[in-house]
């Protein structure tokens, strides 16, 4: 409603919010600040999909910070990487009896929590010492707390010296190359 009102009035507006979802919905341009310093600016899609700094990468959603991203299979090694950021939408979860596209590159995890969020289920998963959030649609078979599932991490942001490297799981990337 706010964006509609701004457009209807034909005014230029600066909207300050700490609600990331609201910022993405309303903005034509987003400026992410951290302690008075501009971290990144761009369209909502640019800022979300191509973060330029560690702060920008972890700003949206319920991103998990992973100290050793090598626990996930088939990602390029970035020597000297400090940590990785994994957003829930990067994580694909399948039950043990489900058909899965990337079974050889999936890892086993325990479902620690399942929360109904209206249009999806939010999962908290434990893979060794790593805790991840993931989403599962209402059209997918329900997973339960305590269940063992397969987890495929499709993408992650690796941080080295505040630079962000967006890495794709090579097993998924190679799948796209098949003709």
Language-model features: locations:
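Short, acidic/hydrophobic/Gly-rich beta-strand patch recurrent on exposed beta strands
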Residues: 85, 122-128, 135
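ABC ATPase nucleotide-binding domains
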Residues: 1-52
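Glycine/charge-rich catalytic "coupling/switch" loops of P-loop NTPases
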Residues: 71-114, 141-179
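Residues located in well-ordered beta-strands
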Residues: 43, 55, 108-112
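C-terminal boundary and immediately downstream tail of ABC-type ATPase nucleotide-binding domains
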Residues: 49-74, 85, 152
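Short, conserved beta-turn/loop elements at beta-strand boundaries and strand-helix junctions
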Residues: 114-120
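Structural detector for hydrophobic anchor residues on beta-strands
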Residues: 11, 65-70, 82, 107, ...
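Beta-strand/loop nucleic-acid-binding surfaces
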Residues: 131-141
């Amino acid at each position: 409603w706010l964006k509609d009102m701004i457009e209807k009035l034909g005014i230029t507006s600066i909207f300050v919010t700490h609600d990331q979802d609201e910022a993405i919905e309303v903005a034509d341009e987003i400026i992410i600040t951290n302690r008075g310093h501009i971290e990144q600016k761009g369209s909502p899609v640019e800022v979300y999909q191509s973060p330029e700094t560690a702060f920008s990468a972890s700003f949206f959603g319920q991103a998990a910070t992973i100290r050793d991203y090598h626990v996930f299979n088939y990602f390029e090694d970035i020597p000297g990487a400090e940590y990785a950021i994994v957003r829930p939408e990067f994580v694909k979860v399948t039950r043990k009896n489900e058909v899965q596209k990337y079974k050889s590159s999936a890892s086993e995890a325990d479902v620690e929590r399942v929360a109904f969020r209206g249009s999806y289920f939010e999962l908290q998963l434990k893979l060794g010492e790593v805790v991840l959030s993931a989403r599962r649609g209402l059209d997918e078979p329900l997973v339960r707390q305590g269940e063992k599932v397969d987890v495929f991490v499709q993408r992650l942001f690796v941080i080295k010296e505040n630079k962000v490297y967006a890495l794709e799981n090579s097993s998924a990337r190679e799948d796209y190359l098949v003709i």
